[in-house]
């Protein structure tokens, strides 16, 4: 009795463990909407992180340039000990005694002292010592290099922020493309499942007809061939879904591929909703042609501004620089402590550099003019891109409406051919062709819907929305 109870407990425990490990992955699956996918990509994608690092580096560079407005303070210290004095000389005291004084000295000094005055004397100084100084230099005029350098650093920070926005737009676009590609493949898989169910029903009808002797076995073989084709399509779609999941997971920084995506499954209803809101949401307006709101245009403007500042910097490098300063110094070179303070002014005038500097200024002027013309040229291209994006939205929307009507027509055509075949007035090839047209209309509708969503995103980005 005890053994039987133990076996029952083991079986119950085994069932519980089986259910736990069977349903745990399903419950652990996360569901992502399109916005969540884009948010995850913006947070985890390497391109966006790299652009953010660029913004932070540009900010530090701007702060570094700001310090040039303030005095430059430096300190210097030196201690030395030489093997002999660095200042050495030999002097004869008699050479420094004037002739008028020599007569009186000869009369008053003994002969030994007079003889000593004629011997050379060696003098040695600065064998060891300590030197220290503290200097502060304030630039007064530097040819505008400090001011223009700070402006250029600010432009660099603005450029890095614009590049971050462009990186975010590109990442958002790619993530949404992957999302709708996965939606398209999943919807096609649903179509394959629906067609497979339809073919199974047709197979049952044909099998009954063949057994009754009112249909040929060839009809049954045609249905089986079409079923094999559907199985082949299912395998390709499964592989495609797996690859897109991997790409989406890597691009958005998701931990694994065991996730599902949430979207409006009723494509037909969404198309009708889009048709009603199209005129309200995506009508061409004045903002569409306002290129100044685009990051690409602003980036070109910053390029012109940077070229102009670089030209001014080249001019400033050939102008005189003026600075004032103050310092405090200490030394004990003469074996006694000595300290003193001082103020000074410096003027530096480039002379030979003017020759090469004049060519540098001309080169910067050419680069500035090139940036101006590039701005004009790319502005026209941005206008064309806006118009092309709007045309793409209109075209994809019309394609979507056509695909919607094609589904209705293909559905009715399939219904009629199925009734005709049952009545014996149509061939199996006509019925299978109607089934193929129905499947193609569903797939085209799925592709048109995904393309419409991508075109809307391109339009929003092309118009700076």
Describe every region a protein language model picked out.
Residues 28-86, 140, 255-308, 351, ...:
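Bacterial Sec-pathway N-terminal export signals of envelope proteins
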Residues 39-49, 56-71, 122-126, 134-151, ...:
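A glycine-/polar-enriched beta->alpha junction
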Residues 74, 81-97, 256-259, 444-465:
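Acidic, low-complexity, intrinsically disordered peripheral segments
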Residues 76-135, 265-278, 325-360:
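Small/polar, glycine/serine/threonine/aspartate-rich low-complexity segments that form flexible
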